[in-house]
């Protein structure tokens, strides 16, 4: 991505984007062989509840740990923390947003708190959820950005609630641990998009990078699934006009 520095000298910011690593299943070694300035982790990297249930006080991520002596979820939590440590060393800046799987088996907003706390341990790892980070005069803004469920279509929400695991294994932050509902994610979609709009519209003279987990266009749907209108509503939103109206958005 090209960006312009305050001294008017042109420079190029190199950004590497990865997502859906699902480290709960196996480790992935991300290298910075391209000498990128920023690594974007755009969701489905780890599960926050494993981090919460197994704090690093029970072991040190800076010492050699025999994974065979750890329980499965404790080993997974160690893997998550070691991954963040490695990418923080490999890349000058790391921008991370949660995907839907980050919330699995935990509470919705509490999971965000757990992830934010873990990222804050590293000075160059920034967790975004309706907030922003300026890197070399480029604005990074975003969050999970759930979809609008086919523009808040009731049939889409009814069907997806019974099909997707999200609405069985993610709990809301209330006393009775009720399941997350599609209408909840639609409200969060609106809130996140409103925040992105606010930041981007207030910075028309800047270069903006929007970071989210879910796709901003149905054009991203694989050819195999392009006619699955209801299910696609859980993965994509039609934000093409939003993007085209804002030329300061250089990357999404």
Q: In which residue ranges do the predicted regions lie?
A:
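N-terminal active-site segment of His-dependent metallophosphoesterases
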Residues: 2-96, 103-110, 175-179
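Beta-strand-turn-beta hairpins that frame and shape the catalytic cleft
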Residues: 11-15, 132-142
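Active-site neighborhood of phospho(di)ester-bond hydrolases with catalytic His/Asp-centered motifs
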Residues: 17-19, 39-44, 95-100, 126-130, ...
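Short amphipathic alpha-helices and their capping/turn segments at secondary-structure boundaries
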Residues: 26-34, 82-88, 127-136, 192-206
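A structural motif corresponding to the C-terminal end of an alpha-helix
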Residues: 86-93, 121-125, 195-207, 241-251
């Amino acid at each position: 991505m090209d960006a312009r520095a305050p001294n008017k000298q042109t420079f190029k910011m190199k950004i590497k984007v990865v997502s859906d690593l699902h480290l709960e299943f196996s480790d992935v070694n991300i290298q910075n062989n391209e000498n990128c300035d920023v690594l974007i982790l755009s969701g489905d990297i780890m599960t926050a509840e494993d981090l919460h249930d197994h704090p690093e006080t029970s072991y040190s991520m800076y010492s050699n740990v025999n994974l065979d002596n750890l329980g499965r979820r404790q080993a997974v939590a160690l893997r998550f923390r070691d991954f963040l440590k490695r990418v923080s060393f490999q890349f000058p800046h790391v921008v991370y947003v949660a995907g839907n799987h980050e919330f699995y088996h935990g509470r919705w907003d509490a999971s965000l708190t757990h992830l934010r706390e873990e990222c804050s341990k590293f000075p160059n790892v920034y967790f975004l959820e309706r907030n922003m980070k300026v890197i070399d005069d480029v604005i990074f803004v975003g969050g999970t950005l759930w979809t609008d469920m086919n523009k808040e279509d009731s049939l889409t929400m009814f069907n997806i609630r019974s099909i997707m695991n999200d609405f069985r294994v993610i709990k809301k932050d209330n006393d009775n641990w009720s399941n997350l509902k599609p209408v909840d994610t639609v409200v969060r979609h609106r809130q996140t998009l409103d925040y992105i709009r606010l930041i981007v519209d207030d910075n028309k003279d800047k270069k903006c990078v929007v970071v989210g987990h879910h796709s901003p266009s149905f054009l991203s749907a694989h050819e195999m699934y392009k006619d699955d209108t209801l299910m696609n509503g859980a993965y994509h939103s039609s934000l093409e006009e939003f993007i085209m109206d804002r030329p300061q958005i250089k990357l999404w």
